[in-house]
Amino acid sequence: MRRILSVLLENESGALSRVIGLFSQRGYNIETITVAPTEDPSLSKMTIQTIGNEKSIEQIEKQLHKLIDVLRVIKVGQNSHIEREIMLLKVQTNNCKKDDVKHITEVFRGQIVDITSTTYVLQITGTAKKLDSFLKIIRNTTEIIEMTRSGIVGIARG
C-alpha cells in the first residue's frame, strides 16, 4: 500500500544521505522523494512516498527517529493532508494534434509553457491520480518525447 512520510530534519550536509541510506540498508524502495528548506532555513522538510504494509512503515518510522538529524516523522493519512505533484511533458505535435493536445491540457487545468513548430511542453499540477489520468489520455493522443515529475509535496489540513 502507498504510504507517505513527512520528515523534518536538520538542513545539513549528509542528512539526506543518511535517510536514503536507511531505506537502502533495510531494502525499502523510495517511490518519490522531495526535500526543501522550511520557513526556518536551518531545517528541511522531506516528503517520502514508499510502498509497504503498516508493520514495515512503523519500522521505518522508528529507525528514522533514531537518526541524529531527524527531528520529527509523521505518517501522512489519506484525508488529513493536501498533496500535489507537478509534471512537465514534452509532446510531439503536428497540425491535426495541436488542438487535441491543447484541449486535453485545458480540461486538466494544465498549461502549455513552451511551443515550437513540432513540440509543446505541458505543465500539469495536481494529485498523483490526476497526473496519471492525464498521462493515460495524452498517450492515446500524441507521442510523449520526454517527461519528468516532481514527486509529492504535502501539507496538513487546517
Curated annotation (Swiss-Prot):
Family: Belongs to the acetolactate synthase small subunit family.
Record pathway: Amino-acid biosynthesis; L-isoleucine biosynthesis; L-isoleucine from 2-oxobutanoate: step 1/4; Amino-acid biosynthesis; L-valine biosynthesis; L-valine from pyruvate: step 1/4
Protein name, UniProt field: Acetolactate synthase small subunit
Gene Ontology terms: cellular component: cytosol
Domain of life from the UniProt record: Bacteria
NCBIfam families documented for this protein: acolac_sm, PRK11895.1
Subunit field text: Dimer of large and small chains.
Keywords for the protein's UniProt record, in alphabetical order: Amino-acid biosynthesis, Branched-chain amino acid biosynthesis, Transferase
Pfam family, one: ALS_ss_C
InterPro entries according to UniProt: Acetalactate_synth_ssu (IPR004789), Acetolactate_synth/TF_NikR_C (IPR027271), Acetolactate_synth_ssu_C (IPR019455), ACT-like_dom_sf (IPR045865), ACT_dom (IPR002912), AHAS_ACT (IPR039557), AHAS_small-like_ACT (IPR054480)
Catalytic activity as recorded in UniProt: 2 pyruvate + H(+) = (2S)-2-acetolactate + CO2
The gene coding this protein: ilvH
Domain ACT: 4-78
Keyword Transcription regulation on entry: no
EC assignment: 2.2.1.6
GO molecular function annotation: acetolactate synthase activity; acetolactate synthase regulator activity
GO BP term, example: L-valine biosynthetic process
Disulfide bonds: none
